[in-house]
Swiss-Prot record:
In the hair cortex, hair keratin intermediate filaments are embedded in an interfilamentous matrix, consisting of hair keratin-associated proteins (KRTAP), which are essential for the formation of a rigid and resistant hair shaft through their extensive disulfide bond cross-linking with abundant cysteine residues of hair keratins. The matrix proteins include the high-sulfur and high-glycine-tyrosine keratins. Keywords: Keratin, Repeat. It comes from Mus musculus (Mouse). This is Keratin-associated protein 19-3. Strong expression in narrowly defined pattern restricted to the lower and middle cortical regions of the hair shaft in both developing and cycling hair. During hair follicle regression (catagen), expression levels decrease until expression is no longer detectable in follicles at resting stage (telogen). Induction: Expression in skin and hair follicle is regulated by HOXC13 and by GATA3. Belongs to the KRTAP type 19 family. One of its GO terms (cellular component) is cytosol. The keyword ATP-binding does not apply. Interacts with hair keratins. Residues 9-82 are annotated as: 23 X 2 AA repeats of G-[YCGS].
Amino acid sequence: MSHYSSYYGGLGYGYGSFGGPGCGCNSIRRLVGFGSGYGGFGYGSGFGGFGYGSGYGGYGYGSGFRGYGCGCRRPSCCGGYGFSSFY
């Protein structure tokens, strides 16, 4: 789970199923920038972040929970929508 469609609802490219750098990261870490895990921002934030591939409550491309864009984690259940969702 380190490329397209990371472990949990990442944007899809790069690596970082759990807090690693790159896009599509989704974990519970508190990083900032590319591949943020929890509450970060930028590409692939994990929880409450914003930008590409946020994991939970984020907004932008690939938000996971309650977000919008492509690569949402739950495209209909949690108010997110898009494509390339994993969970």
